[in-house]
Amino acid sequence: MNTLIAQIEKGKPFFEKISRNIYLRAIRDGFISAMPVILFSSIFLLIAYVPNIFGFTWPKGIENMLMTPYNYTMGIIGFLVAGTTAKSLTDSMNRQLEKTNQINFISTMLASMAGFLIMAADPAKEGGFLSAFMGTKGLLTAFIAAFITVNVYKICVKNNVTIRMPEEVPPNISQVFKDIFPFAFSIIILYAIQLAIKAVIGVNVAQSIGTLLAPLFSAADGYLGITIIFGAYALFWFVGIHGPSIVEPAIAAITYSNVELNAHLIHAGQHADKVITSGTQMFIVTMGGTGATLVVPFMFMWLCKSKRNKAIGRASVVPTFFGVNEPILFGAPIVLNPVFFIPFILAPIVNVWIFKFFVDTLGMNSFFANLPWTTPGPIGIVLGTGFAVLSFVLAALLILVDTVIYYPFVKVYDEQILAEEAEGKSSSDALKEKVAANFDTKKADAILEGAESKEEPATHAITEETNVLVLCAGGGTSGLLANALNKAAEEYGAPVKAAAGSYGAHREILDQYQLVILAPQVASNYEDMKAETDKLGIKLAKTEGAQYIGLTRDGKGALAFVEEQFKD
């Protein structure tokens, strides 16, 4: 097993490079920016159709009234994501350009959204245009519009293909003329693509993409497809790469499109049978976090005999219940631990197989509404599928199956830890032996040991108000450390204020902070982040797995870690 893990780890640099790809990141951040729209629209969808499960149907007029906010938000999500994706990609491009010669992100957003309309919205006979492909069906077209637009702007800006105005002209007026050429070139190129596709295939770009990729989408929804897609989530995470950063952008168009398709099927009184959805990923495959670890903290707490495992279980139960499972992943540890390789990969795959069986064979509706990712898995299953009776059975069955899968491996690992404790090894020594090969914890150990040996944390070096931003992939894990810092700062009177955020959504607020801390799941973005913080004179620190979990549990140590970053 160690040999297999070692072989997998050889590909880690390659996959980390993929996870930092600016185009994949633009897709991910574009969806994050549009998430309020997605979640808001789902509220009306649930109100409109959940009562159907209990035999109550709204009158047609009320149903149409409830669906109006959904149709005018989720129904144009492709149009909106064209803009948010362009904005995110523009931010990444600007970090490669001189500070005095930047791309105007507002202009790229407008050009991308206009270009998207050209490629996705056919003219209506009565005037105006049709909106059939402005929603999730147009997401891939939205990405194309954003990528082409921003690259056209980059070429124009780098080569000064602009209209230069006299210095006497106000900057805001000059910017308008500066953007004319790249805006025009972008629209012309996207329109030319639309004309070519229309001439060859007879339909617009968005419809042609949907037609061409329909067989791929269908294959992805099969057992082999879901095994590869969702098995990759866990495999990447196991070797220390944030799997969703690689997999989610690749399947985002499918997942959100399938949710809308399922909603339309429910609306038509038919069976919602599309399995690959955002709900499947959040509440089935990653129930309790990547690796389907919802049951693991409870098993550590109730079934393990070792003191260390019991303590880790107690500390991990609450965050894991809400999908934040880094405490158990790095605290046990599970990642890079040969004992847990099989269940960590197997449990998510078995979960999605069972879910597909319930949908395809037993006739349960799949997910037709988007919910916040922090919704506890069992609750998300019930809500996202419209309170179907089978959803309660499914949630209970998945918990049982995951317990059976993890049980023998938890017992084996507990025996290992018991043996270590019997030999007189401390918990920190045992943990270090498990993660030292892949997670550098020496600095953390020194900080934590120093913090434990003193009555008070050494916060005297920080005499002025210091704002700390902790970043992770989704904003959940970063909250653990931010809360620990704020509590310790209040207890010991340290002038430190911490906030949690998600990587990619930080750029508008970055200049408000004096220190940025990267959680382990986004530590691979250190070099990119350093380019941003160096420009603003902000300190930057990255953390490793066990180190990060240790800091979230030790406020004194966390304050000491912050102080350490300001020492010359």
Curated annotation (Swiss-Prot):
<dbReference type="Pfam" id="PF02378">
    <property type="entry name" value="PTS_EIIC"/>
</dbReference>
<feature type="transmembrane region" description="Helical">
    <location>
        <begin position="246"/>
        <end position="266"/>
    </location>
</feature>
<keyword id="KW-0597">Phosphoprotein</keyword>
<feature type="transmembrane region" description="Helical">
    <location>
        <begin position="30"/>
        <end position="50"/>
    </location>
</feature>
<dbReference type="GO" id="GO:0005886">
    <property type="term" value="C:plasma membrane"/>
</dbReference>
<keyword id="KW-0813">Transport</keyword>
<comment type="function">
    <text>The phosphoenolpyruvate-dependent sugar phosphotransferase system (sugar PTS), a major carbohydrate active transport system, catalyzes the phosphorylation of incoming sugar substrates concomitantly with their translocation across the cell membrane. The enzyme II LacEF PTS system is involved in lactose transport.</text>
</comment>
<dbReference type="InterPro" id="IPR003501">
    <property type="entry name" value="PTS_EIIB_2/3"/>
</dbReference>
<dbReference type="InterPro" id="IPR003352">
    <property type="entry name" value="PTS_EIIC"/>
</dbReference>
<dbReference type="InterPro" id="IPR041713">
    <property type="entry name" value="PTS_IIB"/>
</dbReference>
<feature type="domain" description="PTS EIIB type-3">
    <location>
        <begin position="465"/>
        <end position="568"/>
    </location>
</feature>
<keyword id="KW-0762">Sugar transport</keyword>
<dbReference type="GO" id="GO:1901264">
    <property type="term" value="P:carbohydrate derivative transport"/>
</dbReference>
<feature type="modified residue" description="Phosphocysteine; by EIIA">
    <location>
        <position position="472"/>
    </location>
</feature>
<feature type="transmembrane region" description="Helical">
    <location>
        <begin position="65"/>
        <end position="85"/>
    </location>
</feature>
<protein>
    <recommendedName>
        <fullName>PTS system lactose-specific EIICB component</fullName>
        <ecNumber>2.7.1.207</ecNumber>
    </recommendedName>
</protein>
<dbReference type="GO" id="GO:0022869">
    <property type="term" value="F:protein-N(PI)-phosphohistidine-lactose phosphotransferase system transporter activity"/>
</dbReference>
<feature type="transmembrane region" description="Helical">
    <location>
        <begin position="339"/>
        <end position="359"/>
    </location>
</feature>
<dbReference type="GO" id="GO:0009401">
    <property type="term" value="P:phosphoenolpyruvate-dependent sugar phosphotransferase system"/>
</dbReference>
<keyword id="KW-1003">Cell membrane</keyword>
<feature type="active site" description="Phosphocysteine intermediate; for EIIB activity">
    <location>
        <position position="472"/>
    </location>
</feature>
<feature type="transmembrane region" description="Helical">
    <location>
        <begin position="283"/>
        <end position="303"/>
    </location>
</feature>
<keyword id="KW-0598">Phosphotransferase system</keyword>
<dbReference type="InterPro" id="IPR051088">
    <property type="entry name" value="PTS_Sugar-EIIC/EIIB"/>
</dbReference>
<dbReference type="InterPro" id="IPR036095">
    <property type="entry name" value="PTS_EIIB-like_sf"/>
</dbReference>
<dbReference type="InterPro" id="IPR004801">
    <property type="entry name" value="LacE"/>
</dbReference>
<dbReference type="Pfam" id="PF02302">
    <property type="entry name" value="PTS_IIB"/>
</dbReference>
<keyword id="KW-0418">Kinase</keyword>
<feature type="transmembrane region" description="Helical">
    <location>
        <begin position="103"/>
        <end position="123"/>
    </location>
</feature>
<keyword id="KW-0808">Transferase</keyword>
<keyword id="KW-1133">Transmembrane helix</keyword>
<dbReference type="InterPro" id="IPR013012">
    <property type="entry name" value="PTS_EIIB_3"/>
</dbReference>
<feature type="transmembrane region" description="Helical">
    <location>
        <begin position="183"/>
        <end position="203"/>
    </location>
</feature>
<dbReference type="GO" id="GO:0016301">
    <property type="term" value="F:kinase activity"/>
</dbReference>
<feature type="transmembrane region" description="Helical">
    <location>
        <begin position="222"/>
        <end position="242"/>
    </location>
</feature>
<feature type="transmembrane region" description="Helical">
    <location>
        <begin position="381"/>
        <end position="401"/>
    </location>
</feature>
<feature type="transmembrane region" description="Helical">
    <location>
        <begin position="128"/>
        <end position="148"/>
    </location>
</feature>
<keyword id="KW-0472">Membrane</keyword>
<keyword id="KW-0812">Transmembrane</keyword>
<dbReference type="InterPro" id="IPR004501">
    <property type="entry name" value="PTS_EIIC_3"/>
</dbReference>
<feature type="domain" description="PTS EIIC type-3">
    <location>
        <begin position="8"/>
        <end position="409"/>
    </location>
</feature>
